């Protein structure tokens, strides 16, 4: 009876995995180290309406995915990343929004002996409030201290753990005595799957403006190289045409070659006084515009002054 129930449960789990991959085009592969059942329940609640969390044994998840490769061969890309204590978070929504929800669900946690430090831990210089009888803890970790007003004072900031270090019993005890909870635990995103593509979660931090700037810089570099080596490309074509047109104008200006676009510059070369006349004609127009603006401002100030005088309040009213 137990075997039948277990077989039925496995079949149900495989069906659930297949249904989720068919329904949701996107998912996160998440690490669940140090995440307790209560925290996991809170995460599921926070994702309600945004995503679905699926946990399970790696062998079962791999087997379910392999059994579904005939219908969706792209899922094979997930298999190398199913290792360690991992699960899936499925979503149809915005990946960055779901990622932010997962980050918000992280909780502070004390250091436990045997845990692996995910980040550097530094004990700041401070008066600990602990009595001299606790000095041995600090000495065991080579932390410089002094006794100040009957309590232990840490003289300098002290790095106590580096990323990847195993937390020892002394470090855990000392951090707990100082009420320092250095770690935060939650579902850590390791890979992102989106409609057959799998990529690092850092890609989600790239904004459209970043892509646009990179693209424009790439086009500019391509155009510069193309112009330098004389190899025409779509990026360099506008610059090549502009440079060619300038060369044509230069040739027309120094020869008898005639074409419509060169007519104006040839006239100016023949009679520079026309250019002076044109410049002189544009100057009064600009001056008249500025004078009109000043006149309008003066009228406005005068109108405001009259309104202030007519407010109807005398000094002794």
Curated annotation (Swiss-Prot):
Any one biological process term the GO annotation gives: cytoplasmic translation
Region Disordered: start-end pairs: 286-317
Biological source species: Ceratitis capitata (Mediterranean fruit fly)
InterPro entries, per the entry: Ribosomal_protein_uL10, Ribosomal_uL10, Ribosomal_uL10-like_insert, Ribosomal_uL10-like_insert_sf, Ribosomal_uL10-like_sf, uL10_eukaryotes
Gene Ontology CC: one annotated term: cytosolic large ribosomal subunit
Keywords assigned by UniProt, alphabetized: Phosphoprotein, Ribonucleoprotein, Ribosomal protein
Coiled coil residues, start to end: none
Lineage, top ranks: Eukaryota, Metazoa, Ecdysozoa, Arthropoda, Hexapoda
Summary of the function given for this chain in its UniProt record: Ribosomal protein P0 is the functional equivalent of E.coli protein L10.
Protein name (record): Large ribosomal subunit protein uL10
The record's account of how the chain is modified after translation: Phosphorylated.
Domain of life: Eukaryota
Composition skew (Basic and acidic residues), residue ranges: 292-302
Complex and partners: P0 forms a pentameric complex by interaction with dimers of P1 and P2.
Molecular-function GO terms, alphabetical: large ribosomal subunit rRNA binding; structural constituent of ribosome
Family in the record: Belongs to the universal ribosomal protein uL10 family.
